[in-house]
Amino acid sequence: MLTAVTGINWGDEGKGRVIDLLAENADVVVRYQGGNNAGHTVVAKQQKFVLHLLPSGILHENVICVLGDGMVVDLEHLTNEIAQIREKGVVVTPNNLKLSKRATISMPWHKIQDELEETRLAKTGAAFGSTKRGIAYAYSDKYRKKTLRLGDLLHLKEESVQNRLKMMLEAKNLELAGCYYQEPMSYPALLSWCEAQAAELWPYIVDTGAYPVSYTHLRAHETGAYL
């Protein structure tokens, strides 16, 4: 059985609370899009958990959580979020958390752009109240094919990935210098950042598109519940 929860407003509809209630009876909980610009608070096991990227299904034992293809993922935020809930006794391993190799990475410059543009707009009273998490800019670059996907972290030593990273950085430096008079970012620093994130998250990165199919096949004799 597949259960879908979606919002019809601009957030704050209570999706997180509904998902937390439904997750108790789910086998797999999938977050298919979005980033860490908003979050939800869940009270479980007499503790408060504030989640921005992880589905609240992560708080339930035997529930597998998936961050899907449509996500834009702030890698540092995700690593910190995992560490924070582990400190409260929640088990997070590659067995119960799967990251789509096709999900988009929120690059360091996305938050920089968001901050600079919001500051520029504020001077004329036109600021729109961005969370400054870089979500819109990550999605924009996704559709412009000017960012990396999580799966690229597994191939950082390949020349094709490094060349793409260099081209992306060159274009972004021109954009930031021309629009906001920013100093250029260096390629070695950017590559080191990518390598550090890969070292933390590589065990979780899989082909989640194929995963539900194989999971269903393995449990063909049961009724799987997907949320």
Place the predicted regions along the sequence by residue:
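Internal alpha/beta core interface subdomains
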Residues: L78, I82-Y215
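Conserved small/polar residues in nucleotide/adenosyl-binding loops
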Residues: T216-T223
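Basic, polar low-complexity surface loops/patches
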Residues: M1-S100, T104-S106, I112
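Single, functionally critical "micro-switch" positions that shape active/binding sites
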Residues: W10, R133-I135, A220
